[in-house]
Amino acid sequence: MAPRRISVSETSRPVLPRHARLKFDETRQRWVILAPERVLAPDEIAVEILQLCDGARDVAAIIDALAVRYTADRAEIGRDVVAMLQDLADKGFLTEARETTP
């Protein structure tokens, strides 16, 4: 089944799809996203954002955490985070967590 593509907003709960994983590559000494036949090397800030994309937190909570951590303007961080996550979603490296049924 193909991953669901998402339109990222502050209410989205992003997560890496099952076929992709974020891993520290010892050989390259950098973080990479591994997917079938593809490797993406995100920068340090993207890695920090991706580590918060656990499917439990929504984008608003991720933005809030980063704004507090860096004592930065929430609106500016929000624009950057949503744009980065949307770019990854468009490339198939990010999807939205599904609701779990009891």
From Swiss-Prot:
InterPro entries: PQQD, PqqD_bac, PqqD_sf. Pathway: Cofactor biosynthesis; pyrroloquinoline quinone biosynthesis. Keywords: PQQ biosynthesis. Signal peptide: none annotated. Gene3D superfamilies: Coenzyme PQQ synthesis protein D (PqqD). GO terms for biological process: pyrroloquinoline quinone biosynthetic process. GO terms for molecular function: quinone binding. Disulfide bonds: none annotated. Functions as a PqqA binding protein and presents PqqA to PqqE, in the pyrroloquinoline quinone (PQQ) biosynthetic pathway. Monomer. Interacts with PqqE. Belongs to the PqqD family. This is PqqA binding protein.
